[in-house]
Regions:
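Conserved catalytic-core motifs of GNAT/GCN5-like acyltransferases
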Residues: 117, 130-147
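Intrinsically disordered, low-complexity, positively biased terminal segments
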Residues: 1-14, 18, 26-28, 52, ...
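A short helix-loop-beta-strand connector motif used in the catalytic cores of GNAT acetyltransferases and
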Residues: 39-58, 79, 134, 195-210
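Short glycine-biased active-site loop of nucleotidyltransferases that positions the nucleotide triphosphate
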Residues: 39-41, 71-72, 130
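Acetyl-CoA-dependent GNAT
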Residues: 44-46, 51-73, 81, 224-230
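Acyl-donor binding region in acyl/amide transferases
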Residues: 77, 85-113, 117-119, 126, ...
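Ligand-binding pocket scaffold of soluble enzyme catalytic domains
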Residues: 3-9, 13-19, 23-27, 34, ...
């Protein structure tokens, strides 16, 4: 068996996406708009894949990001994504060969750092990655929860629809990029794809959007979903899925979580 390593071609773009989703146990069934955005966001020259007799058996890619580092400088950041190896080709050194080629490819483009959101973090230390932040899923009983400290809130939280969210959330995101280390800047196409994803979580229904503003300036926002479980003993019961909480100062952080709780 000879494995070929190379970038995909434009004609192989849908096969690439199907292979990526298959690697995560899903089927690739995008809308036309989502497929067009996928093509623009991750073009063939941003990929590095493994082929066995023409079949895609391994995938990697790298978004072209910019992120803040300690000290406030904004630097180029290769956002590693779509890392999969087919279950039929495991333990054949395919991931190592793809990752080495992809990192060299991105270094040659002038990318200063590489970052990723690891589904299996134990894998990536061998390639030079280190843990930058922990990810936790937290369940909160809102009937018993309150903020321990509530700073002064000079602004306000208000609801917006998806169209206004698309217009004003980027400003809040940019403020958060300057406030936090590591958050990548987003292009218009990335924002369009993000809003499509936010509106397509069918298990939770339609999203709710709120923005935190001070003097009309967006400084934070939240995207969340509600699921009503029923009425028990005269009281309604339900779940809130806080999908995204973006903030750029203590006031926006507290105000948004106070709203959610």
């Amino acid at each position: 068996m000879t494995i070929e390593y190379r970038q995909i071609t434009i004609a192989e773009r849908r096969r690439f996406s199907s292979a990526v989703e298959q690697g995560f146990g899903k089927h690739y069934t995008p809308t036309h708009d989502a497929f067009c955005l996928d093509n623009k966001l991750l073009s063939p020259d941003m990929t590095m894949c493994a082929f066995d007799d023409g079949e895609i058996v391994g995938t990697t890619g790298a978004y072209q990001f910019e992120s803040a580092v300690p000290g406030g400088a904004i630097i180029k950041n290769a956002g590693i994504t779509a890392v999969t190896v087919s279950a039929t080709h495991r333990r054949r050194n395919i991931l190592t060969n793809m990752m080495q080629r992809l990192l060299k490819q991105e270094r040659d483009k002038g990318q200063v750092i590489a970052s990723l959101w690891a589904s299996e973090s134990i894998i990536y230390g061998r390639f030079g990655y280190g843990v930058a932040i922990q990810h936790e899923a937290i369940k909160v009983d809102t009937t018993r929860a309150e903020l321990k400290h509530m700073p002064a809130i000079p602004g306000r939280v208000r609801y917006v629809d998806i169209h206004e969210a698309r217009q004003i959330f980027p400003a809040a995101w940019d403020a958060a990029v300057r406030y936090h280390v590591g958050i990548p800047k987003r292009s218009d196409d990335q924002w369009d794809r993000s809003m499509i994803e936010s509106s397509s979580q069918s298990d939770w229904g339609q999203p709710w959007f709120v923005v935190y503003e001070e003097d009309g300036e967006p400084l934070g926002y939240a995207i969340y979903y509600l699921k009503e479980l029923g009425i028990f003993a005269g009281q309604s019961s339900g779940l809130i899925n806080a999908d995204m909480v973006i903030y750029s100062n203590p006031a926006s952080h507290a105000a948004l979580w106070n709203h959610l709780l």
